[in-house]
Regions:
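C-terminal motif of bacterial Sec signal peptides marking the signal peptidase cleavage site
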Residues: 20-23
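N-terminal secretory signal peptides that target proteins for export/translocation
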Residues: 1-9
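Bacterial signal peptide processing site
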Residues: 25-28
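Sec-dependent signal peptide recognition
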Residues: 9-16
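First exposed extracellular module after export/assembly in secreted or surface-exposed proteins
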Residues: 2, 33-164
């Protein structure tokens, strides 16, 4: 008969404790409304264009307590140009399936925003200007989960549009 030493017993207890604690997942302490934070943009300036001539990648982080982000059918990432607040651009966050017992999720989202036209004081746009060599804007961003909860709204750094 093989006698189990104290150190072997401790190893087995530690292993059992590790397996049990790994099997028990706690739901993260995130609220059910999505929360987003601005991480950055790949460019601080772009050349004006009305046909997607230039772009920048915007990165945000997110948390969502019930993990119901993304939708197959709706546009749920809203990006608003600070110069034209009534006309937001809408994007689709890919569907994230709800899995496991701790349904809270966190991660990062990156999306391309294409160049836009310079808007001049007289309201004209999209032509080169020596009088107004640059225009600037920032984006306001928010997301919505499948339950209809809106996130907080975040602001990007300023982006300079080169009016060439």
């Amino acid at each position: 008969m093989h006698k189990i030493t104290l150190s072997e017993r401790m190893k087995r207890l530690f292993y059992l404790f590790f397996v049990l604690s790994a099997a028990c997942t706690n739901k993260p302490g995130f609220p059910i409304e999505p929360k987003i934070e601005y991480l950055g943009m790949t460019k601080s300036s772009m050349i004006q264009s009305s046909v997607n001539g230039d772009s920048t990648l915007i990165r945000i982080s997110f948390t969502d307590g019930d993990g119901d982000l993304g939708d197959k059918d709706s546009l749920n990432l809203i990006v608003t140009d600070s110069r034209i607040p009534g006309f937001p651009e809408k994007f689709k966050i890919p569907f994230v399936p709800i899995e496991g017992s701790g349904n809270g999720i966190s991660g990062e989202i990156g999306f391309l925003v294409y160049s836009t036209c310079c808007i001049y004081p007289d309201g004209s746009a999209c032509f080169p200007s020596t009088q107004y060599p640059t225009d600037s804007l920032h984006y306001l961003i928010k997301i919505k989960d499948r339950a209809g909860h809106w996130s907080n709204e975040i602001r990007t750094n300023d982006l300079v549009i080169l009016c060439q």
